[in-house]
């Protein structure tokens, strides 16, 4: 994570703890094309609602890195702006409570509704501050309960008690940036941006494919874990070694698309791992065949 990103996170955290995250929304980066300005403006409003102005400022700081950068056209910048906003507003129990309350506010006088979502214990604990969550996770890991046990949570606006509980759950956003889940998401976003940056330097034609790998990670639960695992497998098995110069892969974009097509909802990732190994072997054999003989 860059020094600027760390400072932005710390500045937001300290302001939030003392109740002073009432800053004005951050300004859009200079030099944004008009269509991207619209996307970024919507993202800022989304992230202010999600977490606060300080958090939206982190988004702006991250987006600014790619404004005017060589090789980044309007379409690519728009995709970065859109997909980064989606990932920075990741779905957790706090967000579900926020959206449920927003649904109630948007439909005054309408009958309430209830949604039931199932979470694993590690997901629920992951929304807590890390200093608390780590002790609980260690105990539950020892018991083998963290992923095996599912908990059904009811998000309801049908009663005053349900609404009150939603407000309490939504109010936990104050601690979100100290949570285990946020730490993982922050690392992921920074690594995704880093891989985009490396692609622009090492293999510019693959940059759009790297940008769009963000769509692999969605939601929560098993779908989220599978997407994250598949993303890491593709980046670690294909993109990073190509950028490092240890894998002679001339068409990284095609390889990423091929690997994504092979990804199945399989925790063992058998098909994906076979495909990545096949692509690596093919690239190595091709480079060997075209190498000049001594």
Stretch-by-stretch model annotation:
Residues 1-294:
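Active-site loops and adjacent core secondary-structure elements that bind or stabilize anionic groups
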């Amino acid at each position: 994570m860059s020094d600027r990103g760390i400072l932005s996170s710390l500045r937001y955290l300290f302001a939030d703890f003392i109740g002073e995250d009432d800053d004005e929304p951050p300004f859009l980066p200079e030099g944004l094309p008009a269509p991207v300005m619209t996307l970024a403006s919507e993202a800022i409003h989304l992230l202010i609602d999600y977490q606060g102005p300080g958090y939206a400022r982190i988004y702006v700081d991250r987006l600014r890195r790619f404004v005017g950068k060589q090789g980044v056209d309007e379409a690519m910048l728009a995709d970065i702006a859109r997909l980064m906003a989606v990932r920075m507003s990741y779905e957790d129990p706090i967000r579900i409570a926020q959206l449920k309350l927003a649904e109630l506010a948007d439909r005054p006088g309408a009958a309430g509704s209830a949604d039931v979502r199932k979470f694993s214990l590690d997901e629920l604990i992951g929304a807590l501050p890390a200093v608390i969550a780590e002790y609980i996770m260690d105990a539950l890991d020892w018991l083998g309960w963290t992923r095996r046990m599912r908990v059904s949570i009811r998000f309801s606006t049908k009663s005053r008690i349900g609404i009150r509980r939603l407000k309490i759950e939504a109010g936990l956003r104050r601690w979100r940036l100290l949570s285990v889940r946020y730490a993982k998401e922050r690392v992921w976003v920074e690594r995704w941006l880093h891989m985009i940056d490396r692609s622009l330097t090492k293999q510019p034609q693959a940059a759009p494919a790297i940008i769009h790998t963000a769509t692999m990670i969605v939601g929560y639960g098993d779908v989220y874990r599978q997407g994250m695992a598949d993303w890491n497998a593709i980046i670690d098995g294909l993109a990073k070694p190509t950028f490092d110069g240890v894998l002679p892969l001339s068409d990284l974009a095609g390889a990423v698309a091929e690997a994504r097509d092979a990804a199945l909802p399989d925790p063992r990732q058998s098909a994906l791992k076979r495909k990545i190994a096949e692509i690596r072997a093919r690239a190595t054999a091709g480079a060997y065949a075209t190498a000049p003989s001594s």
